[in-house]
Amino acid sequence: MRKQNGKSDLSRRGFVASAAAATAVASVLPAPAVLAGGRPRVVVVGGGAGGATAARYIAKDSQGAVDVTLVEPSRAYYTCFFSNLYIGGFREWESIGHSYGALAANHGVNVVHDWAVSVDRDNRSVGLAGGGSLAYDRLILSPGIDFRDGSVPGWDLSQQNRMPHAYKAGSQTQLLKAQIEAMPEGGTYCMVAPPNPFRCPPGPYERISMVAHVLKQANPTAKIIIVDPKEKFSKQGLFEEGWQRHYPGMIERIGPDFGGDMVEVRPEAMEVVVDGEAMKVDVCNVIPAQQAGRIAAAAGITDDSGWAPIVPHTMQSRADENIHVLGDAALQGDMPKSGFSANSQAKACAMAVRGALTGSSVFPPRYSNTCWSLIATGDGVKVGASYEATDEKIAKTDGFISQTGESAELRMATYEESLGWYDGITADMFS
């Protein structure tokens, strides 16, 4: 793991160009023969960083040779990445919302706003909640996450309005922000953090930082408690340094050594029970254990882990060569579950799908990821790595991370870099 040293400028153009280069290296793999008959059909389920990117690149780069349909129930997509900044007051809600209109207008993607509820692998079709089905030659599943039933005793989705998860961006994010802002003076915010693996490893701890930022200004005697089943977490040294600097005495973390892995909640009483001891809280943000979005299990491509194993070079399901799985839902190896990862995987997948269906050139993929986090105003940190496809997994080849004790100028530059990345990736997904 190498240190972060120096300022880099990740503009929209630079992000798209560097990401494209990541999927192109010198040697060309043999391409399959072009399918006979009419245009081959690709159905993409899920319109996030994986699915929207895959749909856009297949449609754009095939220049109409492939019929691409994107199935996504929401007409506006709100990014989970940067939703913590909305909670912290650094972004307006509308700034993290995006529409699918340009995918249709600019690239001819057929956008179907419906839920995909079933997959008939024998007949290669996807069933829709609204009725009917969509036939495919290749299916790309990028459904994100669902929560594991019973992972936090006392909590299920029926309690999400009393104790929100806010880990799928949308009304839950807005609800949690409103609850934080309505806390009584000197009140207590509690987060029940998830076990590994889960979406966006630094995400819960950036959220803690953003909640602390809000409370420091509006409710400085409030307390924040993290109940955490994990012994350690992403960027731990950086977050703990930042919490001590910006929010001294406000944040307490209860790890597994003190019962953080033995928690239950009582939503009606607004209580959190840690190792048998109950405490009253005013806001409780429960982030449960996670698994692949339910359509992956419905397709029969998940294993006992709840995630969908894939072939690292193509993101194909190990259970069905005509299905590819992207992003959070994939069991792929060393890459974290992040929007950057999903976008990187989508480009490799799009290249593989075009090669299989049209005979276009296919290159060995290279993957990358960076996760930025904001701790306080202008105090940005990051962690990232490069990866390669092996026969067994997507394997990390090198990495970097911000360092404790960095200058304010470098931290501001890191935050500004994250803003450029956000503009770049959302353009890469939706333009």
Where are these regions (language model features)?
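N-terminal export leaders
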Residues: 9-30
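Beta1-alpha1 glycine-rich phosphate/pyrophosphate-binding loop at the start
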Residues: 35-110, 195-236
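FAD-site-proximal beta/loop scaffold in flavoenzymes
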Residues: 157-183, 278-344, 355
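Glycine-rich dinucleotide-binding loop and its adjacent helix/turn
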Residues: 143-218
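C-terminal auxiliary extensions adjacent to catalytic cores
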Residues: 384-431
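Internal hydrophobic alpha-helix adjacent to the cofactor/substrate pocket in enzyme cavities
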Residues: 342-366
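N-terminal secretory signal peptides
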Residues: 1-10
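A Rossmann-like FAD-binding core segment of flavoenzymes
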Residues: 106, 110-118, 126, 134, ...
